[in-house]
Amino acid sequence: MIVDNSKDFDLKSFLANLTTHSGVYRMLDKHGEIIYVGKAKNLKNRVNSYFSKGAKDSKTLMMVEQIARIEITITPSDYEAYLLENNLIKQHRPKYNILFKDDKSYPYLVISRDKFPRVSFYRGKSAYKKGQCFGPYVSISSVKNTLNTIQKIFPIRQCENSYYKSRVRPCLQYQIKRCLAPCVGLVSQQQYDEQLAILKKFLAGKFSSVLEEISAKMYQASEDMEYEKAQVYRDQLVVLRKLQQQQIVDIQEDKTFDVIGIYMQDSYASIALLQIQNGDVVADRHWSIDAKGQDKTSIMHAFLSHFYLGDEIRNIWPKNIILSKVEFADITDLMNSISQKIGQAINWIIAPAADNLKWLKLAEVNARQKLNIYTSSKSQYQKRLESLKEFLELEKDIKRIECFDISHFQGEATIASCVVYTDDGEDRKSHRRYNIKDIKSGDDYAAIHQAVSRRVSSGLEADNLPDVMIIDGGKGQIHQAEAVFREYGIQDKVQIVSLGKGVERISGKEKIYKGFDDTEYTLDEHNPGFLLLRQVRDSAHDHAIKGQRKKVSANRQSSIIEEIEGVGPKRRKALMMYFGGWQELSRASVDEIAKVKGISKKLAQEIWECFH
């Protein structure tokens, strides 16, 4: 339950009446923004400690000065408090919490929940919504190689559902014995499920068990004189034994380790996670963070909560976790919560010896190397930000940059892209595209005006306008942005700047214009601020081009059908519902198209001819 929702917050009264139960507390500033989330076994003691006398680091003192309100949520146990704390930190990303950002979104193999499931791969945490997950895999290439291997051994379908549902005869995969063709009923549910069960064991690393099971099925089929079936199992064994010779081995759970190394330097920290199976590193992952005012134990605590209490998907959890040396007493409660969530006991090793020590040293060396790369890149980026701030004569540091670019195809399918850079670098999740409507063909000025107007309108409402807005273009384009700023009265809130190639159109010789200033500026092509302008502009250009190409492709496919007399919106929708997409429709035969409700044989012939 939320204890405090009042606007007039009385801190003294709040602290005096706090509960001693376990729970989560949220610190809010005067704008109502959550600036810190924490958990406690005893909320009264923990929250009061922030306001009591005693030594506190500068970061905590700065945070306490900004607290305008506190909210708490009581939880049934310490375990639920850890889970809620972790979810709230990921949701709100408070500025005084230690925040982790994966260096990439890892791929997983997924077995879908269909009656006849398909095996495919997806990136990131959305994978678990699709079905049963296996992974994560180190790279896209590794997961694709596994898919290829699976297809050679287990004839489980990999096709999209839209393609699967549209089949009236087996596809090529069936002919080359890489699919059982459940789409046209050539395999029973029991036979398909048997293959699926063996595949799941294979993906879980139970290699010997898979070999034994297939061998038993082969001999049983032979005894029953089902020789074709026995041959299928024999072929599977041949491929599996070849893999065995390539040193694919069983995963023994007591020999699975997660090794977590931390390296700290100045106000930065890097965490390296090595996943070990049977003496081999099967995956390595890294996180680099700003860690001002934090020690190794607090960083380890935050990381363990982030990684093990979050939505990480793994079919094999480690029996052993090796950690860089930290204060054990400070993380024992968290360790118990992690074991409870995973559903198994974990052997926590904080002072490893012998063989285990070499893994920890390897993780710490990896963490150090990644931190060196991170700090070097961050230093260069900060120099560019500082240089741009100086050129634009800004008083405050630049926290957010947005850049607009327009792309169209021969005046049609106009797209405006907006890319976002923060003081931490490119923020891909915040990139946006705008479909530009109701303007004359090829009118870039009107497109810029519309896109900037829509962005400013939403930005004022959400209170998230950028510090700097870059417009790709020259005087004409920046004048359109200026007009929007005048309409909304924000001339002094956001610095506009445009970057155009000028008459010569030579890269590195771009002309620069500042908002409400007709002076034409040029900067040395090696100037850090100029390099940042070009970097952001090029990113916006690429983002616009990709969006515009998608739109052109969709428009072209749709227009093919629209030209056929008798195919209106309802029939177009029926075709898409049946086939799942234009690509599947283009592959369909006349008879297959005629199966769609409302499509006659004659109309099906006309539709087929459009694609052939």
UniProtKB/Swiss-Prot annotation:
The keyword DNA repair applies. GO terms for molecular function: DNA binding; excinuclease ABC activity. Gene3D superfamilies: 5' to 3' exonuclease, C-terminal subdomain, GIY-YIG endonuclease, UVR domain, UvrC, RNAse H endonuclease domain. It is found in: Cytoplasm. GO terms for biological process: nucleotide-excision repair; SOS response. One of its GO terms (cellular component) is excinuclease repair complex. Keywords: Cytoplasm, DNA damage, DNA excision, DNA repair, Excision nuclease, SOS response. PROSITE patterns: GIY_YIG, UVR, UVRC. It holds the Pfam family GIY-YIG. SUPFAM superfamilies: C-terminal UvrC-binding domain of UvrB (SSF46600), GIY-YIG endonuclease (SSF82771), RuvA domain 2-like (SSF47781). Residues 208-243 form the UVR domain. Residues 20-98 form the GIY-YIG domain. Interacts with UvrB in an incision complex. Belongs to the UvrC family. HAMAP family: UvrC (MF_00203). The UvrABC repair system catalyzes the recognition and processing of DNA lesions. UvrC both incises the 5' and 3' sides of the lesion. The N-terminal half is responsible for the 3' incision and the C-terminal half is responsible for the 5' incision. This is UvrABC system protein C. It comes from Francisella tularensis subsp. tularensis (strain WY96-3418).
